[in-house]
Amino acid sequence: PELKKLTKTEGQILIKLIYRNTGITTFDIVKQLRGGVRAFFYNTTAKFFSMNLKTGFNPKINIEDYFIEDIIQRGIRDNFLDYKKPHKSYDLFELRKIWKKKR
């Protein structure tokens, strides 16, 4: 019930966070748990709201993902968030260098 109250932006971020923490797309998780037909249906529905359940997370190539990673790491540093080892760790200083070069 709680997930039904997400805004479009919150839903997009949740899809990215699921991939960040598991290394598996939301589409593949739904496919494993509910089957391919349901995963296809859910992804088709998500596309009406400008979302894609196959979206991954890569702060090296996507500026939005970089901002999300920055917020997460600051939240952990400042003890607002509990640390949970992600599927893949990112060095925030290296990410900043990458994005400074791209600007």
Regions found by a protein language model. Give the residues of each.
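Sec-dependent signal peptide cleavage junction
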Residues: D91-R103
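Mid-length scaffold segments of soluble, non-membrane domains
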Residues: P1-D28
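Long, amphipathic alpha-helical surface segments
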Residues: F27-E94
